[in-house]
Amino acid sequence: MLYWAAVFFIIAVIAAVLGFGGLVSASASIAQILFFIFLVLFVVSLIFGVVRRPGPPR
């Protein structure tokens, strides 16, 4: 999924350089969706990292 985020980021940069045509709205909305997906995954992994701390060795 990170690969696709990088691909859509590159598409967004190319579209910005070419003058913000019709491609921008599609790539920007996909990039925005991917941003929120990765933000949620980050928060979930952060919570699981705090909750699943290993106890002291026995």
From Swiss-Prot:
Coiled coil: none annotated. One of its GO terms (cellular component) is plasma membrane. Signal peptide: none annotated. Pfam families: DUF1328. Keywords: Cell membrane, Membrane, Transmembrane, Transmembrane helix. It comes from the Bacteria. The chain crosses the membrane at residues 4-24, 30-50. Disulfide bonds: none annotated. It is found in: Cell membrane. The keyword Transmembrane helix applies. It is a multi-pass membrane protein. The keyword Transmembrane applies. NCBIfam families: PRK13682.1-1 (NF010226), PRK13682.1-3 (NF010228), PRK13682.1-4 (NF010229), PRK13682.2-4 (NF010233). Belongs to the UPF0391 family. This is UPF0391 membrane protein Plav_0056. It comes from Parvibaculum lavamentivorans (strain DS-1 / DSM 13023 / NCIMB 13966).
